[in-house]
Structures are given as structure tokens and as C-alpha cells.
Swiss-Prot record:
Swiss-Prot/TrEMBL keywords: Cytoplasm, Folate-binding, tRNA processing
Gene Ontology CC annotations of this record: cytoplasm
Organism: Vibrio cholerae serotype O1 (strain ATCC 39315 / El Tor Inaba N16961)
InterPro entries: GcvT/YgfZ_C, tRNA-modifying_YgfZ, YgfZ/GcvT, YgfZ/GcvT_CS, YgfZ_barrel
Superkingdom of origin organism: Bacteria
Functional note: Folate-binding protein involved in regulating the level of ATP-DnaA and in the modification of some tRNAs. It is probably a key factor in regulatory networks that act via tRNA modification, such as initiation of chromosomal replication.
Protein name, entry field: tRNA-modifying protein YgfZ
Amino acid sequence: MDWQNRFSVLNLSSHDPLPELMLTHLTGWGAITLVGADKKAYLQGQVTCNVVSLQEQQVTFGAHCDAKGKVWSVFRLFHHHDGYAMFQPQSAMEVELRELKKYAIFSKVTIAESSDIALGVMGSQADAWIDTVSETTGDVRRIAGGTAVRMSPQRWLLLVNAEQAEQYVNAWQGLHVEQSLWTRMDIEEAVPVVTQTAQNEHIPQALNVQAVDGISFTKGCYTGQETVARAKYRGINKRAMYIVKGNLSAPLSQDEPVVLERAVGENWRSAGALLTHYRFTDSIAIGLIVLPNDLEHDVKLRLAAQPDTRWHIQPLPYSLSDE
């Protein structure tokens, strides 16, 4: 069997525990790489995170904005091969590549979409498995064929060449699952995400990038910095990203925006579209959405296309209070 066809749907209800060890092929994600003598200085002037202080064993969130502070991409940045990799949703990468390259002609830097394969290791035994393929410690490790990166306590990214990816997949002793479980864990961890449909809509703080340490307020200038700084010091940001959960009366659309409405008195008003979503087998779904940050947490929500549903804001796994 072709290694790329070994991944199957794992049907889970909202009450089922996650298996201890899973591997997935992250075809919906990819990486942009930067190599060259000026890679560090160039990227430092483009993104919200501090590239200069990023150590070999560290990974950081970051955002890339336009001049008005609107986000093109939210990514995980780490050292990869002889440069940097920016891991992010595949659908955002075409526009992000174009914008990131805009001023690169003046620098000794090569910016490209990586041809490496992205695999995701998930479950309570993920750390133990990584230790079997790595001789080092830390959140970023050089492994055969590429790099292993800790995404969260029970998740690792493997960014490796195709030959090594095939070896890992064929030798895998856990479950081979399709990538929606990675999306589910992103949602439950409230990982900031920008896909193609949400590019250039929000400032970083509306996506909680500051809450996951993806913004340095002490580094030098970068594109969009003025807006990002005003949002922090003048309190101009009025939005935040939330986890929402609710019931379904029909499957969610994979092609059209999934819009929520919120109750305003006796009426309903559009609240915006989900950034991403995951459906359980028991007609329950979860998602991420940007909402006004002064909303009451018991506000009533519903799917615009399914008005008989009821959705609610869920607790975030981190604090927004230090914004």
C-alpha cells in the first residue's frame, strides 16, 4: 500500500478519549523556508516574534502583517536544516509567500515553499515515541530527514523529506489517522489560525497571538508594528479568538463559510465565520471564531444555516488578561 493511503478516519464522539499514539499526514499544512546570509535580519523586520533571540531548541508563534497590522499568516517558527521554517495552513501560503518575498530582492535570502512532508504525532505517548527517533532533548530536534517540533504537550510535528516520511509511516506501531484530529487539537488548545479566507482581516491580538507569546513588544521595527503596539498600549483592540461548541442538525459545510449568529434581545445578529471547525460523531462540533472581547461568556449563539442549533463559548486554555 502507498504510504500516503494508510491514514483513515477515526470516528470519535465528544465523550471518547483520544488514543495514546496516532500519526497523521498533514496535507492541509505546509512550511515556508528561509535560507541565506540575511535570513535572520530579513525575517526579524517582517514578523511579530523575536527571530534574533530564537534558539536552536526553541519554537515560537508569530504573525506576519501588512502595513496596517492585518494578519497574512500566523505560524510556528523554528530552525530547520540551514535556515528557518514557518509552519502554517497550506491555504494561506500562496498569498503569504508573495507578501513575505516583497522586499527580499534587497537581501541575501531565499524564501520558498518547503517540499518536505509534514507528519503529526499525537497522543499521550507522543513524547516517548519522539525520544526513540531523537538523540537530543528540547522542543526542536534534528532527526533523520529533517526536524521534530513539539507543538504542545501531546503533539509533535515532523517536517522531513519524502523518503524519511515513508519510513516513519510504514514502521509506525500506533494508529494512522486522518488530519482532522490535528485540527481538533488546534481548536481545543485555541491555537491561532489564519487560512486563506481569513487573511488580511484581523490584527494579531484579535487572534490571541500575544497570549501564546507570539508578539515581542521589545524588538525593533517590523511591518505592522505601529498597529500592534497601539492595540497593546492604547487598548484599541476590541476582539479576541474564542473556542465555541454546539450541536448540529446537519453536517457543516467544507466549502462555504460556517457563520454563527448571536442573540441580541429577541433577535439574532451575525457574529462572524468560524476560522476552523471539527465535527464529532454525536452531532456535536467545536470551532474557533473571532468575537468582540466584551461579550458575556454565556451569550447565546447558533449556526446561521441551522437556526435550531445552540452554541456556547468555551473556556480558553490560556489567559487574555495580560494583553
